[in-house]
Structures are given as C-alpha cells and as structure tokens.
Amino acid sequence: MDDAVGDLKQALPCVAESPAVHVEVLQRSGSTAKKEDIKQSVYRLLKRHNIVFGDYVWTEFDEPFLTRNVQSVSIVDTELKAKDPQPIDLSACTIALHIFQLNEEGPSSENLDEETENIIAASHWVLPAAEFHGLWDSLVYDVEVKSHLLDYVMTTLLFSDKNVDSNLITWNRVVLLHGPPGTGKTSLCKALAQKLTIRLSSRYRYGQLIEINSHSLFSKWFSESGKLVTKMFQKIQDLIDDKEALVFVLIDEVESLTAARNACRAGAEPSDAIRVVNAVLTQIDQIKRHSNVVILTTSNITEKIDVAFVDRADIKQYIGPPSAAAIFKIYLSCLEELMKCQIIYPRQQLLTLRELEMIGFIENNVSKLSLLLSEISRKSEGLSGRVLRKLPFLAHALYIQAPSVTIEGFLQALSLAVDKQFEEKKKLSAHV
C-alpha cells in the first residue's frame, strides 16, 4: 500500500521545492530488457543532457543498449500549465520515469446475444495501445483541460489509497466532457486513459478501455434493454476484479442513454425506457466503488442529459471549438509533419505565436510565412478540431496534387481549403 501511495504522490503535481518531471520511455515491442536496466540507462542519458527546453524527445541514442531496446525517451507535459516552454534543469528536478510497451493488437468487440441478434455492445482495448500513441499530444486546447483531468484522476486514486471516508468527502470517479460535435471529446477520453495507464505503469500492469456503444444497448424491444445494460456491466465487473488492471469505461454520447427518462415523462417513450436509465445509473453506482475504475462520458447535447447522471459527474468540462491561437498550434503541427515527410519542401522555420508577439507581429523575411499562417488561423475560427485536422489533406488533394510543394504554395492552398469549407457549411445550412 505504501508503495502504491508513493507512486501516486510522484505522479501528482509536486508541491515541494524540487519539481517533478515526467519522462516516458517507449520500450521496443520486441525488447525483453529488464525495466531496471532501461531505467539506469535513461538516467545516464538525462545526466548527459542536464538542461532541456520544454517538452523534448530523444529517438537516437549514443548507448547501443538504448538503441536496441528503446524507441523513444520523452520529457512530457511540462507545457500543460506553462504558457510557453521553459528551460528545465533536470539535476534540480525529481525524475518520474514511466517505462511502457505498446499493445499492437487493436480493439476487440464485446458482443451480447439477444435472441437471434448479435449486438456489438462495446469495443475493448488493452492499454497502452499503439492506436492511441501520440493522440494526447495532438489535442490542443486553450485552457488547462488536459492538466485538470490528469490531476483529477490522480487525486481520486490517491484518496482511495489513503482510505479517505467517502461518506465525508464524496467523489464518484465520473468525468463528463460536453460540447459541440467534432471538438475531440472522445479522443481526449481515449488519450487520457492511455496517458494514465503509462503514468501509473509501476502501479498497474496494464489498462483496459471499454467504449460502450450506447445506441446498441437500446434494443428494439425496450423490455430487453435493461437486461443488456446489466449484461454489459457484468462483463466490465470481471475486468475490474483484476486489481492489476486500471479500467476505463467510456460512454460516448451519454445523452442517448439518459434522455429516456424525460422522454418517458412526456409520453414519447415506453415506460420500459425508464428501466434502462435506472439500470445504467445503478451499474455506474456499483462499479464506481472500486478504486481501479474511472468512468469517462461525453455528450454533444448537454441539456438532454438526465439530471441524475449529471449529478454523478465530479468534473463537467466544456470542450468548445478551438480559438485562433489553438488553431495556429494545430496547423503548425500539421505543417511540421508535412515538412518531415518532405511533402512540403524545402523545410522552412516557422515562428510560434509567442515569437510573433515578441517581435510585435512585424512583417519581415523571417516572420512573413508565420504571419500568413496566423491570418489563416483567424479566418478558420468556428471550424471544429476534427475538420481542422482534415484541411491539410484536402488542401493538397484539391489544390496541389503534386509529390511536393513549397510552404508558400501550401499555405495558399490551405487558405483556399478554409474558404471552401465555410462555403460548404453555408450551403448545408441553407438546405437544412
């Protein structure tokens, strides 16, 4: 128990003078090296690079042992709360090493037989999953959403391990992310599950992520739906019983399950729908008592969620469309990737928004392209994160169609793709 509490203390934000720095070590899938040997080699690597600037990744190593056994060493999450990257003196920090290997099997389906039908009720991943690698870093938000969610879950686990009386201080291990479609709510839930599995790898051997298909749990015979919910949660309970696993239950578009109560009151749904709502709430109440489970939920239509469900959520976080500043970061990461793959060639240095601020947004040879990207970001406001990540592909497909392009040519194409996106939205709205 003391070791578990110690792991959690290390993973929580450090209040002491010596700040905690999290270092994620991705061990190669074929490697059988002992974690202790990898740990010592990584410590030597960090000693050789005493000062780093913000988040930093090593993929090439001087030591042959690291080259054979480690894919990457990453200093992570130093920029979640700081507005800008800061220099970090590793010798003055408490290093929290998290060594992990990715599961490459992909998702499996959890089926529930309902008479002659075979209902896919959930998708199931063993974490950390290769499918979600890099997802956390790709999600850009204006406020400290990611750090708040990390801190929340770490605190719930610490309170459980310290045996805090839940009758005196209540926490439910339920997170609700709400906001318009396409803002990355589901992706954030999956990325959070992956991040926590890695961060607590010394405490739990692996993670389990169950994404419940809330639409499938509604049988066309409402009287059967309550039974399906119970069946589904019985399978989840089996996973929770393994105390070496950290279990995440993701219920996407939770309003489709919980809106039934209000519809029933209005006479629009059969009374059996109430049983489904009650079954969901009862099952959540049962599994949330376990210290190794976190329930993650999303909703596109907040006002349609059952009040009894909303009350159970400890954190109700709104996830809105990205601001111009967040859009700039998203586009910048896309351009970096295209330059790395030499679709944009030759490579050119782009300034960050902070660097543009420092020079007063004055246009010169160094800042010209970055200012153009800033302008494109401003006119992209109103588009969802999902659409923004597609736009570089659409820009190339619609306006370039060549193996490589200069960054000037690509930015022109990106600007046209943004204009086209708003035109299409306008046409769709006119026909709705």
Curated annotation (Swiss-Prot):
One Gene Ontology molecular-function label: ATP binding
CDD domains registered for this protein in UniProt: RecA-like_Pch2-like (cd19508)
Pfam families to which the protein is assigned, alphabetical: AAA, AAA_lid_TRIP13_C, TRIP13_N
Which residues does this entry mark as bearing N-acetylmethionine? 1
What is annotated about its quaternary structure and interactions? Specifically interacts with the ligand binding domain of the thyroid receptor (TR). This interaction does not require the presence of thyroid hormone for its interaction. Interacts with proteasome subunit PSMA8; to participate in meiosis progression during spermatogenesis.
User: What does it do?
Assistant: Plays a key role in chromosome recombination and chromosome structure development during meiosis. Required at early steps in meiotic recombination that leads to non-crossovers pathways. Also needed for efficient completion of homologous synapsis by influencing crossover distribution along the chromosomes affecting both crossovers and non-crossovers pathways. Also required for development of higher-order chromosome structures and is needed for synaptonemal-complex formation. In males, required for efficient synapsis of the sex chromosomes and for sex body formation.
In Swiss-Prot or TrEMBL terms, this protein is called Pachytene checkpoint protein 2 homolog
This protein's species is Rattus norvegicus
